[in-house]
Amino acid sequence: MSKSVLCIGATLIDELYFCENTIVTHSSNPAEKTTSIGGVISNIVQHLALLDINVSLITALGSDGDASFISNTFKNSGISLQESTVADDSTGKYISILNSDGNLFVSACQDISPKYITIPFLESKADYIINFDIIVVDTNLDSKTIQWIIDLSRSHQKLLIIEPVSVPKASKLSNLNLDGVYMITPNEEELLAIASIETQTEKELIQSLLERGVTKIWLRKGHQGSVLHERNQLTTLSVPSITIVDSTGAGDAALAGWIFGHIDGEDELTSMQLGHSLALEVLKIKGAVESSMNREKLYQVKKNILQ
């Protein structure tokens, strides 16, 4: 468990609104609200810290109370922010509206990370970045910045994972040189955006990414489970049927669980099972982070699911 992980991307304050009934558009809908630290990369970071992974974060925070709350929370969780930037700006915010079944209806994101996590900024941190074994980046950053991280990771043989975040943001990867990227984790809609080819055949879309130099594509398929594609191997994993409380952060949790398994020396299937297990736990709660999680609990959840 000695490998270290560096995550680079957006940190936000999440405001989630859970509508009491099926949403009526163009009207006011009664709802309950929860507030927490969010952003794809921060959800991943928080779960890795709970699983006792040596994890650090490069992100952009504002000069406000939200930033102080985030900094203090992460410091108490053992998450290093030493190379992050604090700007004279407002900390980013993610607002989502969820239907009564817990599924996302619509969301909006105000994010300062592309403005402040730039190539010159990261160039000044290059010696720090290359000290980590695994680098995880989200697509909230500018496409040129993402390309710089890909190139740095390739030249220093670092294991780079890209989390696509959303369809519009995943499209930033469509014209990038992905050679050397270890893994990308899209859902089916994000896969279409990344592949940027005319065909809509899943096999051809996956093949196009493999030919562009990606080693693994972990395709998330919702209630159908997920499939890990490699050049000479295909690993498929189903998921049990559960009642969803909140779908926010499930994919982030899955990646954190997979990274934990990978660092813990598990094979691909077991790492995927750990990812699914953590995602299923997150689907059962309001919010994107299961704060009671630890490595022993995660292995027990996996065991229970497989029984």
Task: Briefly describe each language-model feature range.
Residues M1, L6, N29, E202-Q307:
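Conserved phosphate-binding/catalytic region of the ribokinase-like
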Residues M1-A60, G65-N76, V245:
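Glycine-rich phosphate/adenosyl-contacting loop at the front of the ribokinase-like
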Residues S4, D133-I134, M183:
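Structural motif
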Residues T22-P30, T185-N187, T236-S238:
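Short glycine/proline- and charge-enriched loop/turn segments
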Residues V24-P30, L50-D133, Y299-Q307:
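Conserved N-terminal subdomain of the carbohydrate kinase-like
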Residues A49, R154, I263:
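Gly/Ala-rich phosphate-binding loop of Rossmann-like dinucleotide-binding domains
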Residues T59, S84, V137-T139, I162-E163:
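Glycine- and other small-residue-rich loops at beta-strand/loop junctions that grip anionic moieties
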Residues R154-L159, P164-L234:
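Conserved phosphate/ATP/ADP-binding segment of small-molecule kinases
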